[in-house]
A protein has these predicted regions:
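A structural signal for multi-pass alpha-helical bundles of membrane permease subunits
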Residues: 1-169
Length: 169
């Protein structure tokens, strides 16, 4: 996936060619510090979109039809049905996708390695990329500290998200 996005976002890639075809000016998506992280994020979101779609589809199919029928009998319109029936039933799936997404976002490595190698000017450097680079350079102290902090941060973020979910339900 990352190789495909690297080719699409290259200076002479398809996206710049389409922009130039319509009279615009191509961007240096992967070599400009202002746009490199955005390009990596777009590739990561696109890569995870199918997984999240399947989770939401399964959650939607798990909502009993009787709830929608009861809402219709009570005179609820589409917006009210969504807020009162669909959204509460999707809450566990939303939490799951959110937690997995946050954890995945902090563990992005392959997209950055393939697309930018942490550059330009370290603009796409993430904790995991930093950790792996330090490990490869045998700077094990910094690598271990980064790994420990990553685990602690992800545990705290997950605990906060779970607590928010418990309060909401």
């Amino acid at each position: 996936v990352s190789t495909m996005w690297k080719m699409l976002l290259n200076d002479d890639g398809l996206i710049n060619r389409v922009i130039e075809f319509f009279g615009g000016e191509g961007q240096k998506w992967l070599s400009d510090p202002d746009t490199a992280l955005l390009a990596v994020c777009a590739a990561s979101v696109w890569q995870g979109f199918g997984f999240e779609t399947v989770i939401f589809l399964a959650a939607l199919q798990g909502i009993p039809r009787e709830r929608y029928e009861a809402a219709a009998v009570d005179g609820a319109g589409p917006w009210r049905t969504f807020r009162a029936v669909t959204l509460p039933a999707l809450r566990p799936a939303l939490l799951f996708v959110y937690v997995v997404g946050i954890i995945g976002a902090f563990q992005v490595y392959d997209q950055i390695y393939v697309m930018t190698r942490g550059g330009p000017v370290d603009s796409t450097m993430t904790v995991v990329y930093y950790l792996v680079e330090k490990f490869h350079r045998l700077d094990l102290g910094h690598a271990s500290a980064a790994a420990y902090l990553l685990v602690v941060f992800l545990a705290i973020a997950s605990a906060i998200q779970m607590r928010i979910e418990r309060r909401a339900s």
